[in-house]
UniProtKB/Swiss-Prot annotation:
GO terms for cellular component: EMC complex. This is ER membrane protein complex subunit 8/9 homolog. It comes from Dictyostelium discoideum. Belongs to the EMC8/EMC9 family. CDD domains: MPN_UPF0172 (cd08060). Disulfide bonds: none annotated. InterPro entries: EMC8/9, MPN. It comes from the Eukaryota. It holds the Pfam family UPF0172.
Length: 192
């Protein structure tokens, strides 16, 4: 359980664009940044999948992400997931729980975030999910703040502009990379 979770506007935009691109599917990805005992700062994301997450594909993705993190002195700090069914937006699907369990066993300090609607009481559109016993449950106490150090523009305006410019078509997940290796699964060329 983390007392403080912050996410940059760029990382937040990428996560939402991934869910917008595959709005009829579940999507998931890895959160990158820095973590200590009491806080996590999410500075980037790596979109993973938008259809069934299969263990062999996940293993290959994790090997690549671990290498990328080592080479760039950045940490894996968590996992994000968006359900296919919006009516059940805050109850993680079974595969999301399995992936979160695996990462929770491997990472010292991690967060599990569900992508939701952006609302007044939830400006990031993210909800923290915590491990409670053997299950993952919504944490009503953790506030996820938006780190505006590099961009103080309102997240709603950023997402609106990105959607108007059809930026969701320019974000690629690891699954798309496996189908077409010319796709930039790190999304380094994506300008938001």
């Amino acid at each position: 359980m983390n007392n403080n979770i912050s996410i940059t506007t760029e990382a937040l935009s990428k996560a939402h664009l991934h869910s917008f691109k595959h709005h009829a599917s579940s999507v998931n990805g890895i959160l990158l940044g820095k973590a200590d005992k009491n806080s996590i700062l999410i500075t980037d994301i790596i979109p993973l999948f938008h259809t069934q997450t299969l263990l062999p594909m996940f293993e290959v993705a994790m090997i690549q992400i671990e290498k990328y993190c080592r080479d760039n002195n950045i940490d894996m700090v968590g996992y994000y997931h968006s359900n296919q069914c919006i009516a059940n937006e805050l109850e993680p699907e079974p595969i999301a729980k399995k992936i979160a369990d695996r990462l929770n066993n491997e990472l010292n300090n991690m967060c599990f975030l569900m992508i939701s609607k952006i609302e007044v009481n939830r400006p990031s559109g993210l909800v923290s999910i915590d491990k409670v016993g053997s299950d993952w449950l919504k944490n009503r106490k953790t506030l996820i703040t938006i780190d505006t150090t590099s961009n103080s523009e309102d997240i709603n305006e950023i997402l609106k502009r990105n959607l108007q410019n059809i930026k969701e078509s320019q974000i690629y997940d690891f699954e798309e990379y496996l189908s077409n290796p010319t796709r930039d699964w790190l999304n380094k060329s994506l300008v938001l």
